[in-house]
A protein has these predicted regions:
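Conserved acidic/glycine
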Residues: 1-90, 131-132, 142, 341-515, ...
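Short coil/turn connectors at secondary-structure junctions
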Residues: 44, 48, 77-78, 99-103, ...
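Acidic-glycine-rich active-site phosphate/pyrophosphate-binding loop
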Residues: 60-61, 172-188, 218-219, 290-291, ...
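Cofactor-binding active-site loop characterized by glycine-rich and histidine/acidic residues
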Residues: 63, 67, 72-264, 274-300, ...
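Thiamine diphosphate
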Residues: 89, 192-410, 492, 510, 577-578, 639-817, ...
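Phosphate/diphosphate-binding glycine-rich loops and adjacent basic-rich segments that engage nucleotide
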Residues: 590-676
Length: 817
C-alpha cells in the first residue's frame, strides 16, 4: 500500500492493447567445432564424461530395480528411483558454467542434476578446497569410505566421493549425504551448491524463490535455479512463486541500492509428461510452456525454449540469462525440452505412449549426438569413447559396491532419528559480523517511545489498567520482533499487510519506520509462497518471520507447512536449519472460514514446534525464544487477546527475556480439579474456577498449555495426582483436538490416580456461526461447570444449562457432529 504509487482512474480506464514480446524457440545454432575456441577441448570433453556418468548412474539404478543386480553384484533396493535416462544433456549443459555459489534445487527426478552440478563444482574448486569440504562434511564419515581405496588425484577422489555419497543416500545409509534420511527424491549436497531436491511436484519453485530472496537481501553472490518439470506448471505454488519473484516492488519501491529482480531461473525440464498425462495437448492449456512467461510480467520473464538435447545450447542459455540476472532483470523462465527414455519410475510400463515415439527420441540420443560432434571436431575417437565408458563403469561399480555393503555403509540406527527432528540451537544472529540495517535507532522509534509511557502491569491496586494505557499483547509481539531485527541482520518479515498497514491487528505498527523495505515488505496474498519462500530463505542461512492473517488460511499453505517447513531439518540430518517463525492468528466473530483453531493439524506433524501464548508476558518471551532458535515454530495468537494487559506476572519487562518452550503455566492453584486450557479459553476457565470456588467450594489447578509441542507433562501429572480429576478446554472443535491428545496421555501416565476419565470441552463440531451466536459454539464457563457436574464431580444444587452427558456425546458422534 505505498502512498507513492497513485492509482489514477483516468490512466487505468484508457483504451488500448497490451503488447506481448516474441518468445525465442531453440535459437542456438553453433556446435562443438564452433565452441572449441570459447571453452577449450578439455571442458568440452568434460561435458561428454559427465553425461556418461549420469547415464551409467541411472542405468545402474534401473538394473537394480528391474533385475536386482548391477555388474554381478546383487542388491534389493526397496526405495524409489525416478530416472532421467535421456535427460543428461539438459543437466550437464545447465551446470557447465555455474559457479559453486550458484545454487540449484530440483525435483524427484534430479539425480542427474546432482551429479552434473557436483562435477561442475569439482572442476572449479581447487584441490585444497575439495579436500577440506570432503573431510569436514559429516565429520568425514563419507570421505573415509572412498579415501581408503582412492588414489592421489584429488579430482578423481572427489568424483568418487560424489558418486558414493549420492548413492549411499539413495540407499538410505548413514554415510550418505543426508545420513540416509533424504533418500532418492530429496538428496542434496550444499558445499557444491546443490540444495534440496523435492518429492512434491513443483515444491522447489517457492523454496528456490526464497533462496534467491536471501541472496538479494543479504547481497550474496550467485544465482538460484529451480529445476522443476513441465507438470509443475499445473501446481498453484509454482505460479505463486513466479509471481512472488516478479513483484514490481523489487524494481520500484526497494531502496535504490537494492533494486532489481530476484536472481532466479525457473527452469522447466519439459519431458512432455506428468505421470501418465501428456502436458501440452492433454493436461495443460499451453502449446509451448515458455509462452506462460508472458502472463507474469511485461518482460515475459525473458522466457525462452531451449533444446535440452544439446548441452551447448543449454550452457549458452544459462550464460545469456546469467547476464540478465547480473543486470537485475530476473526472474527468468527457461523451458528446457528433453525426454525420458524410461518410465516415470521402474514400475511404469509407459502404456500412455507408443514405442515409436520413444524410439524417435532415442535416435537423437544426446550422448551419441554429442560424441559425434566431438569426433567431427577431432576431440574424441572411438578408442577414447570406449575407454571413457569403461572408466565410468568401473567408478560406478566401485561406488555401488561400497554403498550396498552394510558393513561399509550401515544404516542410521532408527533411534537416532528422534535426535534429528530439531536442531535446537541458539542463534542470536545468523551473521554476527554484520550490522543490521535500520532506519532508526531503537530509542527513536515512535512506537517504542509510546510504549515507554504505557503501564507494563495489567493490574494496579487490584484494578485492571484501561486498554489505552496498558501494554498490550500486540505490543509484546512488536517488541520481540523489533529486538530481533536490531540483533540479526539476516532477519526479514513479510506477509499480506506487513508494511505501512502495520501488520495484522497492528502488531507491526512502528516497524515500517525502523526498517528498510528489503527487511519488511508486503507479499502477495499467496500463502503457499509466503511459507515456501520462508523455507528457502531459511535453508540459505537467514531468519524469517512470516504471518498468515488467519489460521484458516493455513490450508492454502498445507504442503509448505506440512512437507517443507516441517521436514527439511530432519531430512538433512540437521545439516540445514529452519529458523522460520510462522505467526498464525486465530479469529472469532468472522464466521466459518475465519474463526478456526487448527493447532491440532500442525501438532500432528513431526518437525514443528507449536506454541499458543495467551498473555502479553508469554507472547513476548515465547516470540523471543522462537526468534533466537534454529527450528520452525508455529506461533498461534488469539485475536480475542491482542488488546489485553498482563494479569498474571507483575509486569511485562522492557528488557529482553525468554520463556522456554515446554512447561505449561499454572495460573491458579487449587486442590479439587485440574483444568487444562489452550489459548484464549484460559480466561473462561478462570471464570469457571471462580464460580466453582465461590458457589460450590471447589478449587482448581488451572494450567495454560502455552507450549503445545514440546509439552512438559510433569506439572500436569503432579496436579492430577493431587486432584484425581481433569477437564481440558480450548476454542478448537472438540473432535480430533489437541485436548484429546493431552487427555489421552494423562490417562496413560496417571491412570491409577484418576477418579474419572479426562473430560474435553471444546467447540462444537460445526461450522463457526455468526458473531451473535458464537456463545453457542465456543466453550463458555457454564459448559465447563456443567461437564464437571455431570461427568466428574456432582455439584450440590447445580442445575445443568447444557447437555454434557455421554449419551449426548454418543448421539453427536453418530451424527458426525
Amino acid at each position: 500500500m505505498p502512498k507513492s504509487q497513485i492509482v489514477e482512474p483516468t490512466k487505468e480506464r484508457q483504451a488500448g492493447i497490451i503488447p506481448f514480446g516474441e518468445v525465442p524457440l531453440n535459437q542456438y545454432q553453433s556446435d562443438v567445432a564452433g565452441e572449441k575456441k570459447t571453452y577449450g577441448e578439455e571442458a568440452l570433453l568434460g561435458i561428454y564424461e559427465d553425461m556418461l556418468l549420469i547415464r551409467e548412474f541411472e542405468s545402474m539404478l534401473q538394473s537394480i530395480k528391474t533385475q536386482g543386480s548391477y555388474e554381478g553384484i546383487e542388491y534389493d533396493h526397496k526405495g524409489p528411483a525416478h530416472l532421467s535416462i535421456g535427460q543428461e544433456a539438459s543437466a550437464v549443459g545447465q551446470a557447465f558454467l555455474l559457479d559453486v555459489d550458484d545454487h540449484i534445487l530440483g525435483s524427484h527426478r534430479s539425480h542427474g542434476e546432482i551429479l552434473a552440478k557436483g562435477m561442475s563444482a569439482i572442476r572449479k574448486l581447487d584441490d585444497d578446497s575439495l579436500l577440506s569440504i570432503m573431510k569436514d562434511f559429516l565429520g568425514g564419515d563419507c570421505f573415509r569410505v572412498v579415501e581408503k581405496d582412492g588414489g592421489s588425484d584429488v579430482k578423481q577422489l572427489a568424483r568418487d566421493f560424489l558418486l558414493y555419497g549420492a548413492l549411499a543416500e539413495i540407499f538410505g545409509r548413514e554415510n550418505g549425504f543426508n545420513r540416509g534420511l533424504g533418500g532418492s527424491m530429496h538428496a542434496f549436497f550444499p558445499p557444491f551448491g546443490i540444495l534440496p531436491n523435492n518429492a512434491i511436484v513443483g515444491g522447489s519453485a517457492d523454496i528456490a524463490t526464497g533462496a534467491a530472496l536471501f541472496k538479494k537481501v543479504n547481497r550474496k553472490s550467485g544465482l538460484v535455479i529451480s529445476n522443476i518439470g513441465d507438470a509443475s506448471m499445473g501446481c498453484g505454488p509454482t505460479w505463486e512463486a513466479m509471481n512472488f519473484a516478479s513483484m514490481r516492488q523489487f524494481h520500484e519501491l526497494w531502496e535504490e541500492s537494492m533494486r532489481g529482480g530476484l536472481p532466479i531461473i525457473f527452469n522447466f525440464m519439459n519431458n512432455f509428461y506428468g505421470m501418465g498425462g501428456q502436458t501440452a495437448g492433454e493436461t495443460m492449456a499451453f502449446d509451448y510452456l515458455a509462452r506462460v512467461g508472458a502472463g507474469v510480467n511485461p518482460q515475459s520473464m525473458h522466457a525462452e525454449r531451449v533444446d535440452g538435447y544439446n548441452p551447448l545450447a543449454v550452457a549458452d542459455a544459462i550464460r545469456r540469462k546469467r547476464e540478465l540476472i547480473k543486470k537485475g532483470e530476473g526472474p527468468i523462465l527457461l523451458e528446457t525440452i528433453t525426454y525420458r527414455f524410461s518410465g516415470h519410475s521402474p514400475s511404469d510400463a509407459s502404456s500412455y505412449r507408443i514405442k515409436e515415439e520413444i524410439e524417435a527420441w532415442q535416435s537423437f540420443d544426446p550422448i551419441n549426438s554429442y560424441a559425434r560432434e566431438l569426433s567431427d571436431a577431432g576431440i574424441l575417437n572411438e578408442q577414447a569413447i570406449a575407454s571413457r565408458k569403461s572408466e565410468v563403469v568401473a567408478a560406478m561399480t566401485k561406488a555401488f559396491g561400497l554403498a550396498s555393503d552394510l558393513e561399509v555403509s550401515p544404516r542410521l540406527p532408527s533411534e537416532k532419528i528422534a535426535g534429528l527432528m530439531f536442531s535446537s540451537r541458539k542463534r542470536e544472529s545468523y551473521d554476527p559480523d554484520r550490522k543490521p540495517e535500520l532506519l532508526l535507532a531503537h530509542e527513536e522509534n515512535p512506537r517504542a517511545q509510546a510504549l515507554a509511557k504505557k503501564s507494563r502491569a495489567g493490574v494496579i491496586d487490584g484494578k485492571p489498567v484501561s486498554k489505552n494505557k496498558v501494554f498490550q499483547y500486540r505490543d509484546a509481539i512488536f517488541e520481540a520482533a523489533l529486538h530481533r531485527f536490531e540483533t540479526d541482520p539476516t532477519m526479514v518479515a513479510y506477509g499480506e499487510e506487513n508494511r505501512d498497514w502495520g501488520g495484522a491487528f497492528a502488531c507491526y505498527r512502528g516497524l515500517t519506520e525502523s526498517l528498510p523495505y528489503h527487511r519488511l515488505f508486503n507479499s502477495p496474498i499467496s500463502e503457499a509462497a509466503i511459507v515456501g519462500t520462508a523455507c528457502g530463505y531459511a535453508l540459505e542461512g537467514g531468519r524469517v518471520l512470516v504471518e498468515l492473517m488467519y489460521c484458516d488460511f493455513m490450508g492454502r499453505a498445507g504442503d509448505e507447512i506440512f512437507n517443507q517447513l516441517a521436514k527439511w531439518q530432519s531430512m538433512s540430518a540437521c545439516i540445514l536449519e529452519m529458523p522460520v517463525t510462522l505467526r498464525v492468528s486465530v479469529g472469532s466473530k468472522y464466521g466459518a472460514q475465519h474463526s478456526q483453531d487448527w493447532c491440532a493439524l500442525v501438532n500432528h506433524i513431526p518437525g514443528l514446534k507449536v506454541v499458543f501464548p495467551s498473555t502479553p508476558y508469554d507472547a513476548k518471551g515465547m516470540l523471543n525464544t522462537a526468534l533466537a532458535g534454529s527450528d520452525p515454530v508455529i506461533f498461534f495468537e488469539s485475536q480475542r487477546l491482542y488488546d489485553i494487559g498482563e494479569l498474571f506476572e507483575k509486569e511485562v519487562p522492557a528488557e529482553y527475556y525468554e520463556v522456554p518452550f515446554g512447561p505449561p503455566a499454572q495460573r491458579r492453584v487449587g486442590k479439587d480439579i485440574t483444568l487444562i486450557t489452550v489459548g484464549a479459553t484460559m480466561y473462561r476457565a478462570l471464570e469457571a474456577a471462580d464460580i466453582l470456588e465461590q458457589k460450590y467450594g471447589v478449587t482448581c489447578d488451572v494450567f495454560d498449555c502455552r507450549s503445545i509441542s514440546p509439552l512438559d507433562y510433569d506439572p500436569l501429572i503432579a496436579s492430577v495426582q493431587k486432584t484425581g480429576k481433569v477437564l481440558l478446554s480450548s476454542d478448537a472443535c472438540e473432535r480430533g483436538s489437541v485436548l484429546h491428545d493431552i487427555g489421552s496421555k494423562i490417562s496413560q501416565l496417571a491412570f491409577d490416580d484418576l477418579d474419572a476419565p479426562p473430560v474435553v470441552v471444546g467447540s462444537r463440531n460445526w461450522i463457526t456461526p455468526c458473531a451473535e451466536v458464537e456463545s453457542d459454539f465456543f466453550p463458555q464457563p457454564s459448559w465447563i461447570i456443567d461437564a464437571i457436574h455431570d461427568r466428574i464431580l456432582p455439584l450440590p444444587g447445580h442445575s445443568l444449562t447444557t447437555n454434557p452427558t455421554t449419551g449426548e456425546l454418543i448421539k453427536r458422534q453418530r451424527g458426525g457432529v
